[in-house]
Design a protein with these regions (language model features):
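Conserved small/polar residues in nucleotide/adenosyl-binding loops
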Residues: 121-123
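N-terminal glycine/serine-rich phosphate-binding loop of ATP-dependent small-molecule kinases
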Residues: 9-116
Length: 123
């Protein structure tokens, strides 16, 4: 039976310590030809838990006769997914972004973008 103030302090401190054992979250952003998604992962009871927290549509647009990615919009979608993490109280400690390997953008000597962000038809 718990009946002393010191016993109650110990129990309270155990509950506080348990509440402070928050999960460590990791974010994976997968950007594909037709959609993108944010997957948040963490470990729970020795198992990896994955949760899709944000999804968006994707596709190329024709610009100057070339198929191009809307890089600024894609960047904004990544930021929107990060905002969703904050909204649900699951802030990642790290993030990785996966995209395509055959599309390109040209840079000048100062690493400034020259021209469009060119994509190939993913068919």
């Amino acid at each position: 039976m718990i009946n002393t103030t010191s016993d109650m302090k110990v129990i309270r401190s155990l509950h506080i310590e348990e509440d402070l054992k928050m999960a460590t979250y990791y974010l994976a952003v997968d950007i594909g030809a037709s959609s993108g998604r944010h997957i948040l992962g963490h470990m729970e009871n020795g198992k990896m838990i994955l949760e899709e927290i944000y999804r968006f549509e994707n596709g190329m647009v024709k610009k100057d006769g070339e198929l191009c990615w809307e890089f600024d919009r894609l960047f904004n979608e990544i930021v929107n997914g990060l905002k969703k993490c904050k909204e649900i109280g699951k802030i990642p400690v790290s993030m990785g972004v996966d995209t395509w390997g055959v599309d390109f953008v040209l840079l000048d000597k100062d690493e400034k973008v020259i021209g469009n962000k060119i994509g190939r038809a993913h068919v």
